[in-house]
């Protein structure tokens, strides 16, 4: 009984999290481009040699930039 309650709670938490995350992401193409541009500009301010936000911190350090 306790095990079933745990899995039910876990399932609800996962569904709620996925619902919240999908609402935060723009669905139209222009919105996605704006979001990508914002991330790219923020990353270029932190490390001009890192083009993508998810570049490894070791790459930024090797190029002389501080990691994002």
Swiss-Prot record:
It is found in: Secreted. The cysteine framework is VI/VII (C-C-CC-C-C). It comes from the Eukaryota. Residues 25-45 form a propeptide. Residues 1-24 form the signal peptide. Belongs to the conotoxin U superfamily. One of its GO terms (cellular component) is extracellular region. The keyword Secreted applies. Coiled coil: none annotated. The keyword Signal applies. This is Conotoxin Vc7.3. Keywords: Disulfide bond, Secreted, Signal. It comes from Conus victoriae. Expressed by the venom duct. Disulfide bonds join 47-55, 50-60, 54-65.
